[in-house]
Amino acid sequence: MSPHQLSITGIGTVSPFGPLRGLIGQRKTELRTVTAWPTDGVRRAFLVEPFRPADVVPGLKTRRLDRLSGWCLVATALALADARLDLNGENRSRIAVVLGTGFGCIELTEAFLQSAAANGYAQADPILFPETLTNAPAAHVARVFGIRGPNITLSHKGLSGEGAVMQAASLLRGGQADLAIVLAGDTLTRTMYEWFEAAAVLSRAASAPAPVPFSPQRDGFVPGESATAVVMESADRARSRGAPVYATFRTGFMASDPNAGVSVARRALAGSSPPDVRMVIASTNGSAALDDLEGATIREVFGGEAPVIAPKTFLGESDSCGILRLIAALSWADNQARPLAMLLGTSLAGGCAALSFELR
């Protein structure tokens, strides 16, 4: 096998489906009513039900952490277990942690700034400040699991999850790590929801059961929240240790221009032809401008040949849900014979991305 072939061998998620090890399967999720803060009009979101991380990972302490940090720790533990990895037998200096997030630890950032506004910075809670840093979740993963390799956090708007996969692939293919824990996550908070409301980007179709990408009735997106962790390693390494393989990452490309989707997707085909792609994983979310832009890319590159799945219909919109969208597609493709899939990402403010995978 080529050293450029990279396998996903472990999956852990904290999502509206709950904390899960491995594939999501054919589970269903429901829109929930936002009750933690007052809202203007429609009050719907794909929310993670509250849970105690220590109930999922015994002994895990998260009381002083931002929710995102706690979720990333849980997702990492689940992914490592799913990959059948015992870190005691690994060189922890050769393990990388890569996190993609749109907003980072926004919940405790809000709390810290509110404390500073009310009492002045001199009286603001100093314990909160370290947990406001965007790279805090990745740092906690390294601390808790004793990982000493490259530790990178990136934020690329709506392409943060896709960017994390590509950064991890660069580290692995460049020989800087043997193994990567790839994380992506964001939480929904009052300030974020209020901003969405003020910007008039949320769907207000209260009667709709879910966002409706590509539908003439679409009128905006429904927000979501999640944290996802996957273990990536070379295909040779995965095979030698008998690890389960969910998908093989082939290649990926990004552009800062959201209108460059056609050229980016064609580059990501990497020698394959459009009919070879058996599944297009869209990032459409019910917003007319984004749906029209990505829809045009799909029609131009793939015509009407490739099946399209729009996971934000049941996951909601968040800047870092690219990896979770892939996991959802893996669940739907579980019984197919190793199809080629294209993960598309379109962000009107962040550009576009296309990543190709061979599903198991």
Spans of features found by a protein language model:
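Active-site-proximal alpha-helical scaffold in enzymes
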Residues: C72-R84, T134-P137, A142-F145, N151-A184, ...
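Condensing-enzyme catalytic core mediating Claisen C-C bond formation in acyl metabolism
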Residues: P3-P16, G22-G25, T29-D40, A200-M279, ...
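Acyl-CoA/ACP chain-elongation machinery
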Residues: Q176-A199, A206-P211, R218, T251-G261, ...
